[in-house]
Amino acid sequence: MYPRVMHAVCFLALGLISYVAVCAENTVTTNCLVKAENTHLTCKCNPNTTSNTNNGSKCHAMCKCRVTEPITMLGAYSAWGAGSFVATLIVLLVVFFVIYAREEEKNNTGTEVDQCLAYRSLTRKKLEQHAAKKQNIYERIPYRPSRQNDNSPLIEPTGTDDEEDEDDDV
């Protein structure tokens, strides 16, 4: 797998887990009489809060309502709905791709690639290749150190040399 795809999957999984942990748990301020099929109420008594009681001996229960099936049909039948689930996934994807869009391109060694240096290196290679071709052409020409008394032409035309010169021009 590509590293970015793996990072995206992990990012979305962590985001979804944190969303379920935070948003699927709502505080209910009743005395735990409201209970649905797909919820689980955990209640604890807060002795400092004595509201809604006849005498001071009973306390008002602080209940937390946790949804037990948050991912059923993308949350359509759960307490927090499909709309917030899809919106959260969209926000997570946008944040993820904005983070990766700002990342600089890196080569295999892990160092940043400078576009100007890469262009210069490519140009230098092309010039060296061109010079090597020219050098090959000049190596075929015989070198004559003293031409003062020599009236013969530098290159003597032969049938095979002309054919090779035509190939070099292409």
Swiss-Prot record:
<feature type="glycosylation site" description="N-linked (GlcNAc...) asparagine; by host">
    <location>
        <position position="55"/>
    </location>
</feature>
<feature type="glycosylation site" description="N-linked (GlcNAc...) asparagine; by host">
    <location>
        <position position="48"/>
    </location>
</feature>
<feature type="region of interest" description="Disordered">
    <location>
        <begin position="132"/>
        <end position="170"/>
    </location>
</feature>
<feature type="glycosylation site" description="N-linked (GlcNAc...) asparagine; by host">
    <location>
        <position position="107"/>
    </location>
</feature>
<dbReference type="Pfam" id="PF06084">
    <property type="entry name" value="Cytomega_TRL10"/>
</dbReference>
<protein>
    <recommendedName>
        <fullName>Protein IRL10</fullName>
    </recommendedName>
</protein>
<dbReference type="GO" id="GO:0019031">
    <property type="term" value="C:viral envelope"/>
</dbReference>
<feature type="signal peptide">
    <location>
        <begin position="1"/>
        <end position="24"/>
    </location>
</feature>
<keyword id="KW-0325">Glycoprotein</keyword>
<dbReference type="GO" id="GO:0055036">
    <property type="term" value="C:virion membrane"/>
</dbReference>
<keyword id="KW-0472">Membrane</keyword>
<keyword id="KW-0812">Transmembrane</keyword>
<dbReference type="InterPro" id="IPR009284">
    <property type="entry name" value="Cytomega_TRL10"/>
</dbReference>
<feature type="compositionally biased region" description="Acidic residues">
    <location>
        <begin position="159"/>
        <end position="170"/>
    </location>
</feature>
<comment type="similarity">
    <text>Belongs to the HHV-5 RL10 protein family.</text>
</comment>
<keyword id="KW-0732">Signal</keyword>
<dbReference type="GO" id="GO:0005886">
    <property type="term" value="C:plasma membrane"/>
</dbReference>
<keyword id="KW-1133">Transmembrane helix</keyword>
<feature type="transmembrane region" description="Helical">
    <location>
        <begin position="79"/>
        <end position="99"/>
    </location>
</feature>
<keyword id="KW-0946">Virion</keyword>
